[in-house]
Amino acid sequence: MALKHYKNSDSTVFNDAKALFDLNKNILLKGPTGSGKTKLAETLSEVVDTPMHQVNCSVDLDTESLLGFKTIKTNAEGQQEIVFVDGPVIKAMKEGHILYIDEINMAKPETLPVLNGVLDYRRQITNPYTGEVIKAVPGFNVIAAINEGYVGTLPMNEALKNRFVVIHVDYIDGDILKNVIKEQSLLQGDKQIEQIIKFNEDLRTMSKQGQISEEAASIRALLDLCDLITVMPVERAIKRTIIDKLEDEREQQAIYNAVELNF
């Protein structure tokens, strides 16, 4: 199946990302959860025909998750030997591929300084497990993404942040959102799609006002909703895809109110 490309009514978002990539700049995609940051990175990877290695950050991320680890392997002579298995950072550097670091502000600040040399003009790292000095081959690029104001995120270290050029990625809307729904979900009826877009606009407004979490207004949740609407009533589809994910009763009630206004 062909990759469904990232779309945005603001063409500068993708065009600038492509320009920064061509200049070999580290790109930091900044925006609300579910706004399409990963889709943008995947689209860029396809457009430039360069594979992408992904790191999903969390508080449990450690150096081995980034660089790799040692393990015991049986060689052709039947003898056991210790070998190093390259992690996503070293693989991307050696192969001239894209390194995508998702939710980089979820990682503990003390984990990421190991990447400083990778992210500056040197484009190299000394593997702390083997002593090997790895110099990135041409084609290697770094894209990272952060969710704004998301639970569990930490402020980015200034030294790390200064190694990136930032592109803000906001939610899509209007005709672009309508086309994305038609291309990436099972829902095709124009009238229902218009209702869903209006409902999503209300959710985004409530999210910006702090009444509900960003995830409730995400494009990801919206596309799930559109699929479910084709097999069940819209009210139940909203309950399954959005409301039941929320723990706060006030957030749930706010969305129930939006449902009553829109459907």
UniProtKB/Swiss-Prot annotation:
Keywords assigned: ATP-binding, Nucleotide-binding
SUPFAM superfamilies referenced in this protein's UniProt entry, alphabetically: P-loop containing nucleoside triphosphate hydrolases
Residues the entry annotates as binding ATP: G31, P32, T33, G34, S35, G36, K37, T38
Entry superkingdom: Bacteria
Single GO term (MF): ATP hydrolysis activity
Gene3D superfamilies reported in the protein's UniProt record: P-loop containing nucleotide triphosphate hydrolases
Keyword Manganese included in the entry's annotation: no
PANTHER family in UniProt: MAGNESIUM-CHELATASE SUBUNIT CHLD, MOXR FAMILY PROTEIN
Similarity field: Belongs to the CbbQ/NirQ/NorQ/GpvN family.
Record's protein name: Uncharacterized protein SAUSA300_1302
Native organism taxonomy: Bacteria, Bacillati, Bacillota, Bacilli, Bacillales
